[in-house]
């Protein structure tokens, strides 16, 4: 079977990670060979970069530094883990990818979507997912979910203002409109079962070539 690459995006607290975990189980039950991974991280070097980026103590980090660190982690992750898995015929489910950088650093940080895209084009050399699912939710609801989740570790980006998180969402919606051939938007405020059904439908359409 031909390998596939799917990425999943959303503001903090959209339930993205929960959906990906459920999707992984669903696909495995169907007999697919699945790799679940995340960004920043996924491989040792990228995980070390992740610890630097998300450390709550690093409040002085410049936006461009942040963007470059994400791109560096992404490059290593792609070469070391994602591409080999796709070549081996696996279905790769990635919790965040390029679009996170476009929304967070490009739009919310005000560095420019095109500028951040250019940095990432250099990092990934044109290797985009075949499909990206963006889980959309009001940031206020998302942050309330995070605060209720006692098991989730609070990172540096969680500590940003509510207005920043609204900018992130606005950035995502602009990106989804611009790259509508690759990105689909799912309303994550709907019941979990409904969101999951839409997620499965979108992924299976790609896998089965519908």
From Swiss-Prot:
Instruction: Please give an example of a GO cellular component term from this record.
Output: cytosol
Q: Which InterPro entries match?
A: P-loop_NTPase (IPR027417), Thymidylate_kin-like_dom (IPR039430), Thymidylate_kin_CS (IPR018095), Thymidylate_kinase (IPR018094)
Q: Which UniProt keywords apply?
A: ATP-binding, Kinase, Nucleotide biosynthesis, Nucleotide-binding, Transferase
* Enzymatic reactions: dTMP + ATP = dTDP + ADP
Give me the residues that bind ATP, please.
10-17
One GO-annotated biological process of the protein: dTDP biosynthetic process
Q: What Enzyme Commission number does this protein have?
A: 2.7.4.9
| Class of this enzyme | transferase
Entry GO MF terms: ATP binding; dTMP kinase activity
Role description: Phosphorylation of dTMP to form dTDP in both de novo and salvage pathways of dTTP synthesis.
| Similarity comment | Belongs to the thymidylate kinase family.
Descriptive protein name = Thymidylate kinase
Q: Which gene codes for it?
A: tmk
């Amino acid at each position: 079977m031909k390998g596939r690459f799917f990425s999943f995006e959303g503001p903090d607290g959209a339930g993205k990670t929960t959906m990906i975990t459920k999707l992984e189980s669903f696909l495995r039950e169907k007999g697919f060979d699945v790799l679940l991974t995340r960004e920043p991280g996924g491989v040792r070097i990228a995980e070390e970069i992740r610890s630097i980026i998300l450390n709550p103590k690093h409040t002085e980090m410049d936006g461009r530094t942040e963007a470059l660190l994400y791109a560096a982690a992404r490059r290593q992750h792609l070469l070391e883990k994602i591409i080999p898995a796709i070549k081996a015929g696996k279905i790769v489910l990635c919790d965040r990818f390029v679009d996170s950088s476009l929304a967070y650093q490009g739009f919310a940080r005000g560095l420019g979507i095109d500028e951040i895209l250019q940095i990432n084009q250099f990092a990934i050399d044109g290797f985009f997912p075949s499909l990206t699912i963006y889980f959309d939710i009001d940031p206020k609801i998302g942050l309330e979910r995070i605060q209720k989740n006692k098991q989730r570790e609070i990172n540096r980006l969680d500590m940003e203002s509510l207005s920043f998180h609204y900018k992130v969402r606005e950035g995502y919606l602009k990106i989804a409109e611009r790259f509508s051939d690759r990105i689909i938007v799912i309303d994550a405020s709907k019941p979990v079962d409904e969101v999951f059904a839409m997620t499965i439908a979108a992924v299976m359409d790609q896998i089965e070539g519908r």
